Amino acid sequence: MKQVKIGIIGLGGRAETLLASIVALSGEVVVTAGCDYSQAKIDHFLSLFDKYKLKKPKTYLRHLDLLDDKNVDAVIVPTSWNSHIQIACDAMKKGKYAAIEVGGAASCDELWQMVHAAESTGVSCMMLENCCYGRNELMVLNMVRQGLFGELIYCECGYEHDLSEMGYRTDSRQERSLHNLHRNGELYPTHGLGPISKILKINRGNRFLTLTSTATKSRGFDLAARSRGIENVHFNEADIVVTNIKCANGEVITMTHGVSLPRPYSRDCRVQGTKGIWLENSKGVYIEGISPRYDKLDVAGNPYSTHEWTPESDFYERFDHPIWQAYRNHEVGGHGGMDSLALRAFFDAVKTRSTPPIDVYDVAAWMSITCLSEQSIAMGGLPVPVPDFTNGKWVCREPEKPSRWSLNEVY
């Protein structure tokens, strides 16, 4: 397969960003089809091909019609959250790889349907979780695999981002606003959980066992709505949701979701092992025997030690992941190059007809956190079991084929 022929289902703003990243890959892939139920969005999408001086794709109003197009090898699905899984299932049943955008699941039932579709067809799907290909996330993965962190004990991650403007966008039926209006849980889990899961070898020798979630009161979105004169709305989504996940190998992951209060953006990543720690919010790493440690005396002459962070960037020269060694001087696409790396990984899987580096079991496990956290919160924070979507295969998975795009090992 010389060129991957891609169909894009869902032609909103995210599709426009992804198209820009695809165009920047120059020749590796061609968009041969597009689909949206809105003719206006189709028309705008086609106008972008005039801008890029590219041949216009065939367009459809129904995704099932696009999936019958023999000139499409695989599909990218940047649609509304609740339609990702159904479209992915439909694509796999037609023999086409599917790359879905990020989001959480509405139920575990739909996740099992997705897993069964992949297993029965031999065609997989992938989540385009770009943060798995972030430079620091991959560097820490590389350092962990080389043993610098020792045995992993505890991790943190999350999504904290001031998106309070969603409080006054419900009238426009903005989908993300509606989820926050009606639901209460860990609604956007994968930006932090994806990289942390790969570092912890989830679904390959480890798995999520149980979770508990706790939610605060909800004020931020309501205040944002009132600032625009909207008085008759109350958002269910808590200002802060905290979720603790217990893993089979004994690690604990703490997740924090907060998108309605004033704050800078963070994915809150922390990786703590017996020999070191990475803390995203400090922009630092501490590795025993490498990072600064000073023995001092207090005013009474008693000895004590202080420890200092080493800047993340100080480790790039020795521990930059091979992917970033190859691409750091040639960043293309959105989110600092992460978008294009995730896309390249997907296109490589399509070309080689191999399992993507983020496979259907990963997608199911990560997305399940949303609906399971809702259940835990509704029951006052009671523990909820996380399904084993691998049906036991996590204990001794068949080794993956070595690939530069792997997120499990470093090749």
Task: Tell me the role of every PLM-derived stretch.
Residues 74, 80-81, 85-133, 147:
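Beta-strand-loop-alpha-helix segment that lines the small-molecule cofactor/substrate pocket
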Residues 123, 150-154, 376-392, 402-411:
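C-terminal capping/lid region of NAD(P)-dependent oxidoreductase domains
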Residues 1-52:
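N-terminal Rossmann-like dinucleotide-binding module
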Residues 255-265:
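Glycine-rich phosphate/pyrophosphate-binding beta-alpha loops
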Residues 56-62:
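Conserved SAM-binding strand-loop segment of SAM-dependent methyltransferases
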Residues 28-32, 349-366:
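Glycine- and charged-residue-rich phosphate/anionic-cofactor binding loop of Rossmann-like
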Residues 224-238, 246-247, 275-358, 395-411:
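C-terminal glycine/acidic-rich active-site capping loop/insertion
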Residues 10, 121-124, 131-235:
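Predominantly a Rossmann-like dinucleotide-binding segment in NAD(P)-dependent oxidoreductases
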